[in-house]
Regions:
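Short, mixed-charge low-complexity intrinsically disordered segments
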Residues: 38-59
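Surface-exposed loop/edge segments in extracytoplasmic proteins
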Residues: 15-21, 52-56
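Amphipathic, hydrophobic secondary-structure cores in small proteins
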Residues: 18-45
Length: 59
């Protein structure tokens, strides 16, 4: 990953994870995931560059 080391994904209506944003720090990624979950009323998660889930957010 060149832009951000943490991926923020959202669970779309088809129950597929979709890349929503990237962030350089886990703190920013987690905060963004919570905010996105509230705004779009969908579940979100934060992954590291290896694909491990580090945080999840519920609407």
């Amino acid at each position: 990953m060149s832009q951000g080391q943490f991926r923020i994904e959202e669970l779309n209506p088809f129950m597929e994870w979709h890349l929503h944003a990237t962030a350089a720090s886990l703190e920013i990624a987690s905060e963004s995931a919570r905010e996105i979950a509230r705004k779009i009323e969908r579940r979100t998660r934060v992954l590291d560059e290896k694909g491990a889930v580090l945080a999840e957010g519920d609407p």
